[in-house]
């Protein structure tokens, strides 16, 4: 399948496709509902899938990740969005020591996606422009 569009449009289409294909897929994050996300990657999801599957969260990356892990352990397929990847580090403990190790700790799968923009070049300064993945190599 070929796609002709922007990176954000491709992400949005992938989310729509996943949510259409599997009713267990849900999205959660800051301002992802009516606002459509910081970079508009979730525009239209709330209108199409409703507030039970498109969940606006408080400004707490730990709460977003913890909720996604819990939802995944209960059979959902959450896609958790960080407004900016800089703040993913605030929830790194949960992603590394709970989500990633659940298989070895409890024999459980955590089918969750944690995503967000990095190094977008939007002039966001030291707390909204970092490419966190570079730090993990």
Locations of the language-model features?
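Thiamine diphosphate
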Residues: 1-137
């Amino acid at each position: 399948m070929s796609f002709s569009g922007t990176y954000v449009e491709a992400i949005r289409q992938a989310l729509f496709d996943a949510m259409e294909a599997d009713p267990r897929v849900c999205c959660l994050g800051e301002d992802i509902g009516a606002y459509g996300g910081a970079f508009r990657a979730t525009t239209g999801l709330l209108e199409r899938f409703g507030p039970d599957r498109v969940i606006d969260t408080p400004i707490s990356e730990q709460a977003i990740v913890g909720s996604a892990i819990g939802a995944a352990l209960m059979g959902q397929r959450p896609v958790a969005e960080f407004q900016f990847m800089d703040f993913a580090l605030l929830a790194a403990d949960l992603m590394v020591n709970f989500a990633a190790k659940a298989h070895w700790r409890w024999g459980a799968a955590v089918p969750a996606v944690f995503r967000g923009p990095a190094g977008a070049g939007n002039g966001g300064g030291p707390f909204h422009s970092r490419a966190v993945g570079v730090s993990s190599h």
